UniProtKB/Swiss-Prot annotation:
Its EC number is 4.2.1.10. One of its GO terms (biological process) is chorismate biosynthetic process. The active site is at residues 23, 101. GO terms for molecular function: 3-dehydroquinate dehydratase activity. The lineage of its organism: Bacteria, Pseudomonadati, Pseudomonadota, Gammaproteobacteria, Lysobacterales. It comes from Stenotrophomonas maltophilia (strain R551-3). It comes from the Bacteria. Substrate binds at residues 75, 81, 88, 102-103, 112. Pfam families: DHquinase_II. This is 3-dehydroquinate dehydratase. Transmembrane segments: none annotated. The gene is aroQ. Belongs to the type-II 3-dehydroquinase family.
Amino acid sequence: MAKLLVLHGPNLNLLGTREPEVYGHTTLADIDQALAAQASTAGHAVESLQSNAEHVLVDRVQAARNDGTAFILINPAAFTHTSVALRDALAAVAVPFIEIHLSNPHTREPFRQHSYFSDKAVGVVCGFGADSYRYAMDAALARVRVAGA
């Protein structure tokens, strides 16, 4: 059984009510519940954490190095375009990760079109709403099976 970590960045606690025309009506609790079921069906465990505080996410990424986390799925949200600290933490722990976005940042404002994470990620899944998480989990589960975790 592998342990997967799902990290949600700032404002994602407002999913379902914040700009539903951009982010949809699915709540973060709905997403976390679906991911836990998806991983459990495959025989794996998921831990999810949402924080509006950069240091909380950095601390959790650093802890992943020693707690048996096999894979990280992260929606850095607004930190996508600003957080060198979170990027450096992900690079330092060397746990593979997938970057996730509900919307497609490449079709949005210019400042949203650059990611500090994409070049370090195994892959990026964006633009499919809440399904972006499901697709990313599919990819992560395939990779932990291949790795024998």
